[in-house]
Amino acid sequence: MKLIHVFSIFGTAESFFDGQFEYLVNLGYEIVVVSSDSPLVDAFCRRNGVRFVPLCIPRSVSPSAITKAVKALCSLIRTEKADAVFGHTPVGALCAMFAARMCGVKNRVYYRHGVIYTTMRGLKRTIFKTEEKFVASLATSVVNVSHSLSRLAIIDGLNGVEKQYVIGHGTCGGIDAQNIFNPDLIDKVKLLTLKEKNGLTHADVVFGFCGRICNDKGIPELVDAFEFFKGKYPDISAKLLLIGGFDIRDGVSEAKKRQMRNDPDVLVTGNVDKDVIPYYYSLLDVFVFPSHREGFGMCVIEASAMEKPVLDSRAHGCVDAIVEHETGEYVELSARGICKGMEMMLDSSLRQRLGRNGRRRVLNCYDFKVMWPLVGDLYRKILK
């Protein structure tokens, strides 16, 4: 069976499907990956045994760009005689599902990695919510990456319950908790070098975040919470380590950037290579994720796999990623609510217990070895 997976950017394929595609190829599927080109494509294709076709798939709503992409996809689908087309991310999925429907493809699968309208207002919210409904109506199956996202889809009428699925406990296919996100693999000398590079000491209590530095991720609230915390506990040497770069489309205000720059205890790494992400998690005492919306909070389970306790929001896609009082604690999406969670995490025995439980949960629920067979089961169920 020949499957075409359509992505707006190649990074989505590399981040979430590297290894999983190889697993599916070994099950007998032929996979063609479609996205904008990338220098990482050749190595990815060799590792996974897939083919790649470069096409310009728009990331934003542009009628002319979407029309051009749909025409190109229709031509490709007919040439390849695809048995199934998978669409990822809102606009990429719109192009993929529309083209597949026009070509009469029997299996049209929309991977809903998240929804963006929930943090919008007015006409913009209506437009993007309508787009979600339209894409889902074109699909024969919708794979939501979390159970909370599935509940939201039903509440907001995005699609019927009969066509939507979640893989296991959620995510696109889990993480590698054995060979990548594994605290036992951390080189102590390398970790010490990284700690010194970031100006951290053994005396510091390090709160951390990983991801895009933007409003939707709750960065303004997190920075203010850290300021409250330091004011309340001046004798504690606390640091806030933000692992990631500043986002352009949803960037924090200039005033907030100045606040961050003027606080020597707020450390911003900028974009870092994915190979060193486990080392950055290892620098943390507590992982904080005050996001306003997610498909699934992947960095939460990455941090949990590294035995880090988590302060998490209850937003859709976030709420699934921890078990309250067992692997982490929920916090209110406000500066004072996050600060209250930080205070709770001053208990080192609590941090250790939550961290140990977190890794155990990831191994049981989200490791590749657990998730990939479930992906195979889903494909057998939904593909005709």
Go through the PLM ranges and name each one:
Residues 196, 350-365, 374-377:
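A short, well-ordered alpha-helix in the C-terminal region of glycosyltransferases
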Residues 324-325, 329-335, 344-349:
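Conserved acidic donor-binding segment of nucleotide-sugar-dependent glycosyltransferases
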Residues 292:
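Aromatic "clamp/platform" in nucleotide-sugar-dependent glycosyltransferases that forms part
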Residues 77, 271-272, 279-284:
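Short alpha-helical donor nucleotide-sugar binding micro-motif in glycosyltransferases
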Residues 39-40, 139-181:
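A short, active-site helix/loop in glycosyltransferases that binds the activated sugar's phosphate group
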Residues 309-312:
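Short hydrophobic beta-strand element within catalytic cores of glycosyltransferases
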Residues 42-45, 228, 233, 239-268:
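Short, structured helix-loop element that forms part of the nucleotide-activated donor/catalytic region
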